[in-house]
Amino acid sequence: MLQSLAGSSCVRLVERHRSAWCFGLLVLGYLLYLVFGAVVFSSVELPYEDLLRQELRKLKRRFLEEHECLSEPQLEQFLGRVLEASNYGVSVLSNASGNWNWDFTSALFFASTVLSTTGYGHTVPLSDGGKAFCIIYSVIGIPFTLLFLTAVVQRITVHVTRRPVLYFHIRWGFSKQMVGIVHAVVLGFVTVSCFFFIPAAVFSVLEDDWNFLESFYFCFISLSTIGLGDYVPGEGYNQKFRELYKIGITCYLLLGLIAMLVVLETFCELHELKKFRKMFYVKKDKDEDQVHIVEHDQLSFSSITDQAASVKEEQKQSEPFVAAQVSAYAEDSASH
């Protein structure tokens, strides 16, 4: 009897704090995934780093042996200055790009990477005035960019996601959940093809030193706003039509980022993912229900859209289809 009471009380305790348990598992899972990534990256990249260090030591020792008039401190001072300039996007190599890093098209490309928080790090402000302006420009520009992307994604999602799903649901009677899943998968496949595979093939042709994997890697790193900066297009030696190429890359990054956000928003609107996300949210109390606090669904990535406007939009979209079905039903009844 006591054991059954204890068991039932434990079950009630777990159910009462189910959201907290799920959140704790979520935090633990994220930390484990972080450690897993660190272990894999370290085991894969550390041997290559060690080989590169050994190769550089051999080259340095051989160079000093062949040029006895040059001391090691002088060589290190020269190399340090060269590396410092390279960090600012300036190279001393004769076959390096002779183009300026701060002409208009390059500055436009830099501004787009700053506002999208991609930040390759290949070109950075050199002067104190440029660094100060970059801070002010980013403080204003990044929220402005988020507002712009929110408005664009909301409008595109209405026409690309909600209307097609609602049409197949009302016109053909398919389950809204099933149509949403199929539509999200198809949209994701089209987006990956148009903004990853095809551009990767184009970059592998335009960039002499890039293969398809490196080009695909650049597309993913850029559109996911990681922006490591190890691959930057348009920086090759004697790049043809460099200005036009830079403008095209800027447009590609902006359109690709919008497409990625539309796909993410489409997946976040799936009923199954909404239920899954609610497992980790704090349940609202009755007092919270009485005041108009933002619902938990809006705390997810899908909060970038105005959900109240979305509901109204869906209602407006459903009216023509419902009216058409009612009129068709009335005509069939009159004919019989």
Swiss-Prot record:
It catalyses: K(+)(in) = K(+)(out); NH4(+)(in) = NH4(+)(out); Na(+)(in) = Na(+)(out); Rb(+)(in) = Rb(+)(out). The record marks T118 as: Important for increased permeability to Na(+) when K(+) levels are subphysiological. The chain crosses the membrane at residues 21-41, 133-156, 182-202, 244-267. One of its GO terms (molecular function) is ligand-gated channel activity. Residues 104-116, 117-122, 212-224, 225-231 dip into the membrane without crossing it. Its main location: membrane. Sumoylation is controversial. Sumoylated by UBE2I. Not sumoylated when expressed in xenopus oocytes or mammalian cells. Sumoylation inactivates the channel, but does not interfere with expression at the cell membrane. Sumoylation of a single subunit is sufficient to silence the dimeric channel. Sumoylation of KCNK1 is sufficient to silence heterodimeric channels formed by KCNK1 and KCNK3 or KCNK9. Desumoylated by SENP1; this activates the channel. Desumoylated by SENP1; this strongly increases halothane-mediated activation of heterodimeric channels formed with KCNK9. Glycans are attached at N95. The keyword ATP-binding does not apply. Residues 117-122 are annotated as: Selectivity filter 1. Ion channel that contributes to passive transmembrane potassium transport and to the regulation of the resting membrane potential in brain astrocytes, but also in kidney and in other tissues. Forms dimeric channels through which potassium ions pass in accordance with their electrochemical gradient. The channel is selective for K(+) ions at physiological potassium concentrations and at neutral pH, but becomes permeable to Na(+) at subphysiological K(+) levels and upon acidification of the extracellular medium. This is Potassium channel subfamily K member 1. It comes from Cavia porcellus. The gene is KCNK1.
